[in-house]
């Protein structure tokens, strides 16, 4: 489990706890939440644990060694740290499946390590494909690893495609177009501001942007939902996963979040996957595919819901959506720049250094400044370099333009 203390990680471990006959946790990676990590170690007794930060490894070691009696695991895990440590855990010899729940581009290298080791991947970290699709897809084909989408929208598409013929050379989701697939419709809740008028967004606060009406998620992805960048990034991910060009991947606002996405086939029939907005459903399917595991989870009752509604997204309200389409069509290193610039812009917003409305502005400026250096056939090092450049570029922009786009100036 990559990112065990985050939203995806905790829900994945809940599934493992509920289904002990099907799943055994052998490796955990985490950031700095040692209290929760230690509880996870006690409960799941993994063979290896990796910390992203080397400086807190001694503290973890000391705290684990001090455990006594029933609190002490039967065997303490092998402890590693840093990038090398994350890669060791991601490619751990006894793991069959790696669930990638590390937020952002930080999940790229350990995910690649898992792929190179031939592990199947339950992909909840969309940035891996968005930033490095041209690198990841060839590695999947070389290693034979299977990529199973673990986020709700791409899981929905994947589930709908189970009844369609796959080409023999396709290894599940590796960008090879599925015969008969005409169109993908990604559903979006509309995020925290779906019921706000566009002109009212100038009053948007951090609290407003991080309060999602339907889903329980981390702060970063909740802000991405509010800007609709999350859905724009999912368009790029769907392109790499399912092989359709961008003109055949649509976004539709569906406030109830019951239909998680739809596919249209060549005969004009449309298949949809439905369920309550609960991330455990797509995570479980990615973990158990091609099987279905019986659960006691809440069952969907359409009579209880009453109605399902849909409408087109407002591009003036959600400029990030069009930025994502443009970056995807530009291809090469541009999606990596878009992704990194967005991560930095959202971080700056959460730090109260820019206003919500400035998130798309700084992203667009970074993408525009990258056009002259765009690489169409990037290698891994190219992706890493432009990721670093884009983050620095965004911070530099905000520093230079602080008189215009800081929160303090905005309040004046």
Swiss-Prot record:
NCBIfam families, per database record: Dxr, PRK12464.1
Pathway: Isoprenoid biosynthesis; isopentenyl diphosphate biosynthesis via DXP pathway; isopentenyl diphosphate from 1-deoxy-D-xylulose 5-phosphate: step 1/6
The protein's enzyme class: oxidoreductase
InterPro entries xrefs: DXP_reductoisomerase, DXP_reductoisomerase_C, DXP_reductoisomerase_N, DXPR_C, DXPR_C_sf, NAD(P)-bd_dom_sf
BP terms from Gene Ontology: isopentenyl diphosphate biosynthetic process, methylerythritol 4-phosphate pathway involved in terpenoid biosynthetic process
Co-factor(s): Mg(2+); Mn(2+)
Highest taxon above the source species: Bacteria
Molecular function via GO: 1-deoxy-D-xylulose-5-phosphate reductoisomerase activity; manganese ion binding; NADPH binding
Keywords: Isoprene biosynthesis, Manganese, Metal-binding, NADP, Oxidoreductase
Family in the record: Belongs to the DXR family.
Gene3D superfamilies: 1.10.1740.10, NAD(P)-binding Rossmann-like Domain
Residues binding 1-deoxy-D-xylulose 5-phosphate: 126, 152-153, 189, 212, 225, 230-231, 234
Signal peptide (from-to): none
Binding residues for NADPH: 5-8, 31-33, 125, 127, 218
UniProt binding sites for Mn(2+): 151, 153, 234
Listed name of the protein: 1-deoxy-D-xylulose 5-phosphate reductoisomerase
Reaction(s) catalysed (UniProt annotation): 2-C-methyl-D-erythritol 4-phosphate + NADP(+) = 1-deoxy-D-xylulose 5-phosphate + NADPH + H(+)
Upper classification of the organism: Bacteria, Bacillati, Cyanobacteriota, Cyanophyceae, Synechococcales
Physiological role: Catalyzes the NADPH-dependent rearrangement and reduction of 1-deoxy-D-xylulose-5-phosphate (DXP) to 2-C-methyl-D-erythritol 4-phosphate (MEP).
E.C. no: 1.1.1.267
